Amino acid sequence: MEVLLTSGPNDTALTWGCYPMVPYAGRVRSGVVRFDNVEHQLPLTLPPHAAHGTAFAQSWNVVDASASRIELFTDLGSHWPFGGSVSHRIELKDDHVNLELRVTAGDHAMPAQVGWHPWFCKPSRTSLIFESMLQRDEHGIATSRCVQTDATNVDDCFV
């Protein structure tokens, strides 16, 4: 059974599969990252904000692979002002899949956040249970406040 949506001829890297969101997940307000008292401008991939990191647009190298496991590696790209790299290990089990992301800073400390953006095939009947999510502000940016949800909108940050 196919679980994740696969790409079509007009799809972008952001509309299918289960891509890693690294070195940031979700939206970065106005694409501005402030770290160590320095402001950095990121590309506005979801105007007027930066979204979903840089790794999805990078070419990945296969480090190791078997019939049920693969380990991939890439740098964080020129659009990430701090350098660094990420490895992604995917392992298929009998009844689940293990996903692991490891982010490594370059020569200096850096902020980092990871997540995955799955696009699931919609079965004829769906049952999802989420207890809480990060509340969004008026611009659609996740805050640090957890709120209860009725899960009617599943394009969110659930905890």
Model-inferred region functions:
Residues 1, 74-120:
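Acidic, contiguous internal or C-terminal segments within carbohydrate-active enzymes
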Residues 5, 42-44, 112:
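Short capping micro-motif at the N-terminus of alpha-helices
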Residues 1-40:
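Beta-strand-rich N-terminal accessory domains
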Residues 14, 77, 156-159:
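Beta-strand-rich recognition/accessory modules
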